[in-house]
Amino acid sequence: QRQMCIRDSYNSLGYSKENGNVPGVSMTRFNLTSKTSYQINKILKIGVSIFANRRKNQNFVSDKYGYSNPVFYSRTANPYFYPYDAEHNYQYDYDILPGDEPDLKRGFNIFEERENTDNETIISSFNSIFDTELRFNDQWKLSSQVGIQWDQSSQEQYVGENTFNMRNIREDSSYDENQYIVPKGGMHTVNNATTSQITWKVQGEYKNTFNDIHDIQIMAGSEIRKNWYNTQFTAGYGYDPKTLTTKPLNIRNDKDAEKYKLHTKTYQENAFASFYTTGSYSFMSRYTIGGSVRMDGSDLFGVDKKYRYLPIYSISGMWRASNEPFIQRYKWIDNLAIRLSYGLQGNIDKTTSPFLVGSYDNVGLLPGYDKEQTIQIEGAPNSKLRWEKTASYNLGLDFSVLNQAINLSVDYYYRKGTDLIGKKLLPLENGFETMTINWASMENKGVEINLQTRNITTKKFSWYTTFNFAYNQNKVLKINTPDSQETPSLEGYPVGAIFTLKTDGIDSETGRIRVKAKNGKSMFLEDLYKVAIDEWGIGIYTPQVSTLEEREFYSYIGTSDAPYTGGFMNTFNYKSWELNLNFSYNFGAYVKTTPSYSLTKFDASRNTNRDILDRWTPENKNGKFPAILTACLLYTSPSPRDMRRS
């Protein structure tokens, strides 16, 4: 009689703590892994795997401008500002926000900010897998697997009363004279998100060899998956961390209530089902053909039944030429194979829906009346919504020689995506400006090369090299361009296309940027856009060109995605030591850089790039960079506030 025994077992427990570059920033991690398989009898094996993880991140709460980030603040702060006085009391920078005068109600001190805010995030996850395997013989095998997954993210934030962040929030809520929506005190928020999922998978496999020359492998199975996702957010104002109490908001109307939400909750549930089969046949280990068919279904496409399931499939073939007699006589050739495949893949865009989707809300329809429950429509329904599809064509070559000393792999691919989700303009009588439908299209094609070499191998020393090269070209074949879009359509261009106005240097008399029109004529921006004269001198201009005309101003210069990418890796081993030298490269991409200073909103009280020293001024008409301008496009000197701070 055969008794159940433990066949394999693996258990690990880990704990780690990392401190950030800034005091007060840290992360602790705890993880547990346990995998055990049991041999019940000759043909039955079961397994249990448990994965648990808990991560705690400690940080500070960042204000909406990002000033509490030391890296950002160090690049923008006034370099002459002292954060403490002689008695080590906080001093405040009242010029941290742009404006003509200091804001005495919104002083900023980065050390006070980091002392009186707290941001704690706890991420917990638990994943268990229960699998069963029935191996009847060397040819037949049946397996089943059940997976249960649970993930939770809990974030708790505290912003103290004595912080720039809280002062700024409260001042933004002011109205009339010294009246505020947000009460005095701090702010406490809790944001929780939970994801649960259960998966059941069953699969059967058959493989056999006939007459030592025919190899057959067949696999079929199904997978059913359901997941649940919910979030909950709560906020309290006027918070006192000692008494753990909050104060009510001074809500005047529905607009205030919408801006300062105290509680929100969302819930989402989805189900998926997949059925698949794959098979391959090989003759004399030289000629191999394979294929697969898969049916994926989702309740995201529940209106039209014919769109619920997407049949995806692939076919492939391979000729292992190195097993041919006329090549086997060349002993230095280890492997030579040519691969060819075609496949259709599907994708789900969960931001869209075939149903009329809305969110509940409580709105006061008329002044003086109680609020009524309403539904805010989020978009037009599309009963024909279906899967996005991608067709792929692949051709590959594998080549290795000299006892695997040199291994080369070359692949060419072409992929075309159809029925991609995109927005389509609708006649206004439909009640919606746009509808999300399956109609966009794009293509990708390219080459990938991988070369691995074994350069030196001895008893104590070895040197291996890996070289990767990839070229990719993509193009948008069909996309909707809204009438309000000011830049050219992406249709016919790469996804990362960059369109720019061609410049023609800096005007020597005014320091302003000149642009070059399509006819080659050099002019100012207001001439190009036919801007109406600002009669009142308050910086309000009205362009006299349509968006269609404006698109013609732009020229395509390139893409932000590098067409050529790759890497070069070297691995050196000496006894028990290993050294890795890795390099990567990207060619052919254009990078958009942010101007090193603002032409119209420059603040001399803030730290800035040295480029500004080489700007155009009446005394430096050969400056490399444009002049500082007012909203009326006139040269300006520093403001009284700037002169006071300098």
Segments (PLM) and residue ranges:
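Residues embedded in well-ordered regular secondary structure
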Residues: 1-3, 7-23, 61-64, 89, ...
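Conserved small-residue
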Residues: 233-240, 437, 454-560, 600, ...
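Low-complexity intrinsically disordered tracts that form flexible linkers/tails across taxa
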Residues: 57-75, 479-483
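Extracytoplasmic gating/loop element in the C-terminal half of outer-membrane beta-barrel translocons
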Residues: 111, 165-167, 173-174, 586-637, ...
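Transmembrane beta-barrel wall of Gram-negative outer-membrane proteins
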Residues: 1-3, 7-60, 70, 125-129
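Acidic, glycine-rich flexible loop segments
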Residues: 1, 66-111
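Glycine-rich, aromatic-lined ligand/substrate-binding cores of catalytic
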Residues: 560-591
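Extracellular/periplasmic, surface-exposed regions of secreted and cell-surface proteins
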Residues: 29, 35-44, 49-54, 102-159, ...
